[in-house]
Amino acid sequence: LSYRLMPSENWNFSVFGKYYHQFVGGPIATSSNQSEYVRTTRDVSSMGYGAAGTYFILPGLQAKLSYEKAYRLPTIEEMFGDEGLEMGDIGIKPENSDNLNLNLSYTRTFGKHSVYVEGGLIYRNTKDYIQRSIADLSGGKSAATYINYGKVLTKGFNVSARYGFGRWLSVGGNF
């Protein structure tokens, strides 16, 4: 569900909501050598939301700001394993994060030449980060499993540039 407001040609604003739902059922190993199984089910739901806005500071120069409360639901392999080298954890929680992005972009065309440059800042505050780890089993064997690691903070930036000539050449890159 989303709503977009455009009060002028220079700026717009949108808000949105997301409903995450996951129901799974399958066998879970009940012994350390993975020889005995029991059928297990799990039902998880969460609400995500966010807002985004753009504003043209000058013709061709645009600022973008967005925030999202997001979730990443565990995969089937993370919950149930692969019956070989990976053990699942049916109790693993979804990752949830607060994501913030701030971008500035500039575009200009002169004659047949066009230039586009964009730079952005990224901030992610992730809780219950799902991490793959190695667990020791009986008999000197080991297997991969998944755990909720805790809090992970990500800060970064990105830069991209593109040059175009007419309709037949476009060269760009990003970092």
Where are these regions (language model features)?
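Outer-membrane beta-barrel translocator domains and adjoining extracellular loop/strand segments
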Residues: L1, G25-Q34, T75-E83, Y129-S138
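Hydrophobic, lipid-facing positions within transmembrane beta-strands of outer-membrane proteins
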Residues: L1, M47-A51, A63, G88, ...
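Transmembrane beta-barrel domains of bacterial outer-membrane proteins
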Residues: L1-L5, K155-G166, N174
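Signature of Gram-negative outer-membrane beta-barrel scaffolds
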Residues: L1-L58, L73
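Extracellular loop and loop/strand-boundary signature of outer-membrane beta-barrel proteins
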Residues: L1-S2, T30-T40, G84-I92, S142-N148, ...
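Transmembrane beta-strands of outer-membrane beta-barrel pores
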Residues: L5, Y19-G25, Y67-L73, F80-D82, ...
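Transmembrane beta-strands of outer-membrane beta-barrel proteins
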Residues: F13-V15, Y49, A63-L65, V115-G119, ...
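Membrane-embedded beta-barrel scaffold of Gram-negative outer-membrane proteins
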Residues: F56, Q62-E68, P94-K155, G164
